[in-house]
Every structure is written in C-alpha cells, then in structure tokens.
A protein has these predicted regions:
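A short acidic/basic microdomain associated with nuclease active sites
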Residues: 44-61
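Conserved catalytic cores of phosphodiester-cleaving nucleases, focusing on short active-site segments
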Residues: 27, 50, 71-89, 100
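Solvent-exposed, charged helical/coil patches
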Residues: 1-49, 120, 125-144
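Nucleic-acid nuclease catalytic cores
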Residues: 84-144
C-alpha cells in the first residue's frame, strides 16, 4: 500500500469522527455551509490541516477552463471531502467527488450528507486506484 493512501485512509477515519461530532451537536436540517464551517473547526481543534472552497484550475493542451470548480475540503493534501445537506443524494454528487479526485490526483474521497438522521447512512468513501503514482505526463491537468 502506498504511504499517501495509508495517510489518507487514516485521516478519513478522523474526518468521519469529526463529522459525527458535528452531527451529534447540530443534527440534520441545516445548510451545507454551516456544516462545512463546523467541520473545519472540529478539524482545527484536532490539529488536522484542511483548506476549503479552493478553485480547481483545469487545463487541457493549453486550454484553461473558465468554469470555476470548487471543492469543499482538502484535508492534509491527500483526502478530499465533499459535503451535502440534502434529502436525497443525486448520483452526480458521487461523480463530482470522483472528478475532483481525478483532477487533483487524490487517492481517497469522502462524500458526507449531513441531512441523514443517522450520519453513518450518509457517509460514502471513494478510492481512486493508482492516484498519486504519476510516471508520465497527462494530456490534462489541474492545480489549486
């Protein structure tokens, strides 16, 4: 197993614990941005570095995409977290997370839906096989 994958896997458990703590205090029914701020605070309290709402710059053969893409949380540069607060997750939510993971070459992602009464029913983990193992160059790339 790759060291970055192992690091992301260990962090995913800590982030899930932090999300459960936020959900225990705030419950379902709030808007996504509130959960994002609370989760970021919970991670700060545990000295887990995370950045929020960064723009993902996408480029393809010299073409830079004008459409801004923003992820919710990047934890310690190896775990991507997308947050939702919706009654029913749309399949596009998982596709969005997977796209960000591919663009940023991140091995593990979490999709967390805080609207669920029991949060464990709203947590999905995704793994990007081969992430962060680039040998050659890609035709497309992304950066923060």
């Amino acid at each position: 197993m790759l060291p970055l994958y192992e690091k992301a896997d260990a962090l995913s458990r800590k982030v899930i614990g932090a999300a459960i703590e936020v959900h225990r205090h705030k419950g379902p029914g709030l808007i996504e941005s509130i959960y994002e701020r609370c989760l970021l605070r919970e991670l700060e309290l545990h000295s887990i570095p995370a950045t929020t709402q960064k723009i993902v710059r996408v480029e393809y053969k010299g073409l830079v995409f004008d459409e801004p893409l923003r992820f919710d949380l990047l934890v310690d540069d190896c775990l991507l977290v997308e947050l939702k607060a919706v009654e029913l997750l749309h399949p596009s939510s998982k596709a969005q997370l997977f796209s960000y993971m591919k663009l940023l070459d991140i091995p593990i992602g979490l999709l967390i839906n805080f609207h669920e009464p029991l949060l464990k029913n709203g947590i999905f983990q995704m793994v990007l096989p081969g992430a962060n193992q680039k040998e050659g160059s890609n035709d497309s790339q992304a950066s923060l």
